[in-house]
């Protein structure tokens, strides 16, 4: 019903508390369908793919990326082996993957590295990058240490006045010791107040469950202050101006151990 009438996805349904709201209240939110309508109006079609292809995205935002990565198709075998020597534990990502699909955490001590790389490169129906593992700031990592717990901030860039508008924000927390934080892998979301950076909702998932504390670590979710919040917003403002033709974007941020 919520999808048909309001265009709400499963994550919208729980993020916006549709199960507790009246029809008039449900109409106030930017749901999945409205999100895509805004994207069509605000974003230049030719440039949208830059945000969908991880190689293009990483190259375009190289100055802000903050992590090492390598393309398995363009790198030599020697370069790939050197990368894995530097990062014995690494992540493999499909360059067109989303929602956590195609993401694997690899411990090189548990595999034949040469054989694994040969298999990756030979695949004609997929294209992968390798990424270094990140260590995030302890206060966020402690929610779920088995994954990176990202902050999603949605922005709308007013190109005429060169102003970045922040539409909404949420934290995405892993669950069940999975190595990704996405809803589709039982992740937990919680809403963040744009002005203060404080989590203002209970945690929620796609199984209609809500959480005051994380079910594994028991760290309290509601009321948590996101560290470096002003810096997070400043970072997004800089990123928006690097791609002014794609004005409506959901950014995923990781606050690293050193606060960057």
Where do the PLM segments sit?
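Conserved N-proximal alpha/beta basic substrate-recognition cap immediately N-terminal to
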Residues: 1-82, 98, 236
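Short amphipathic alpha-helix with an adjacent loop that forms part of the alpha/beta core around
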Residues: 79-85, 119-121
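Phosphate-binding site of ATP-dependent enzymes
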Residues: 113-203
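Core nucleotidyl-transferase/polymerase catalytic module
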Residues: 203-206, 214-248
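Conserved metal-phosphate-binding beta-hairpin within the catalytic cores
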Residues: 242-260
């Amino acid at each position: 019903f919520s999808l048909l009438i309001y265009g709400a996805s499963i994550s919208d349904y729980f993020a916006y508390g549709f199960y507790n709201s009246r029809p008039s209240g449900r109409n106030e939110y930017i749901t999945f369908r409205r999100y895509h309508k805004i994207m069509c109006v605000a974003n230049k079609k030719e440039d949208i793919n830059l945000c969908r292809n991880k190689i293009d995205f990483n190259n375009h935002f190289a100055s802000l990326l903050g992590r090492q990565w390598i393309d398995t198709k363009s790198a030599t075998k020697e370069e790939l082996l050197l990368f894995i020597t530097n990062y014995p534990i690494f992540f493999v990502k499909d360059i067109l993957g989303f929602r956590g699909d195609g993401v694997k955490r690899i411990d090189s001590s548990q595999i034949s590295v040469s054989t694994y790389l040969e298999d990756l490169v030979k695949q004609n129906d997929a294209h992968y990058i390798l990424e270094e593992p990140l260590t995030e700031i302890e206060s966020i990592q402690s929610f779920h240490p088995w994954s990176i717990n990202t902050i999603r901030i949605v922005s709308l860039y007013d190109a005429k006045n060169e102003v970045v508008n922040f539409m909404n924000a949420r934290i995405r927390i892993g669950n069940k010791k999975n190595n990704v934080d996405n809803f589709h892998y039982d992740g937990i979301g919680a809403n963040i107040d744009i002005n203060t950076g404080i989590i203002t909702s209970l945690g929620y998932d796609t199984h209609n469950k809500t959480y005051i504390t994380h079910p594994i670590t028991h760290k309290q979710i509601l009321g948590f202050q996101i560290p470096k919040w002003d810096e997070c917003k400043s970072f997004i403002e800089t990123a928006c101006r690097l791609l002014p033709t794609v004005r409506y974007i959901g950014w995923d941020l990781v606050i690293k151990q050193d606060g960057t």
